[in-house]
């Protein structure tokens, strides 16, 4: 996979994308990430990338020209090795980024993230993009932090990056539910003991316990996720039992 990032602050990405799983993914050849400072594509001597909006208003807007020229350069560089792929604009008004979105992007061969700054974008920039994405209902100083999060979450699902694909697929949200509690050695730490079922060696009992705890945690912390979760018949029965445990007067 090739990932291009357009940013006015390329140095921000050095500490995050060069470390841990994303860094290893690049070292192992699973992902090629390039960060481009689109200020390099300005045409005026002062290297301006922003200007006041027509019609007046507060703040400054990113100009279309540097972004378009930077995208043209990326297309020329990659046209013989990668398809154009999806272009994701960082925008608070965009689609909420989640695990499903990350898994979706991981299927692509080429992704380009455009990081904004200032008040917003010249609307014509949107002609370049296939997706607009947001981390949530709040505004950041720039799109760099959002792009880092999205790249990290996406790279985890690129085939080969995590040797055991059951690992990312077991993460919270991958199956629509929160992840079950996990423990490691020692089995007894300061009086806090690991549930006996996890040390029993009974794999079926462990599977059932994990399923129940995942549903319980989701019900307690993020009940909204259950509205769209695709539950098996077994999960539905367990969930009904959990609801009765929490509220014995709830309808059966």
UniProtKB/Swiss-Prot annotation:
CDD domains: TrmD-like (cd18080). Its EC number is 2.1.1.228. One of its GO terms (molecular function) is tRNA (guanine(37)-N1)-methyltransferase activity. One of its GO terms (cellular component) is cytosol. It is found in: Cytoplasm. It catalyses: guanosine(37) in tRNA + S-adenosyl-L-methionine = N(1)-methylguanosine(37) in tRNA + S-adenosyl-L-homocysteine + H(+). It comes from the Bacteria. One of its GO terms (biological process) is tRNA N1-guanine methylation. SUPFAM superfamilies: alpha/beta knot (SSF75217). The keyword Secreted does not apply. Its main location: cytoplasm. Keywords: Cytoplasm, Methyltransferase, S-adenosyl-L-methionine, Transferase, tRNA processing. Specifically methylates guanosine-37 in various tRNAs. Belongs to the RNA methyltransferase TrmD family. This is tRNA (guanine-N(1)-)-methyltransferase. It comes from Limosilactobacillus fermentum (strain NBRC 3956 / LMG 18251) (Lactobacillus fermentum).
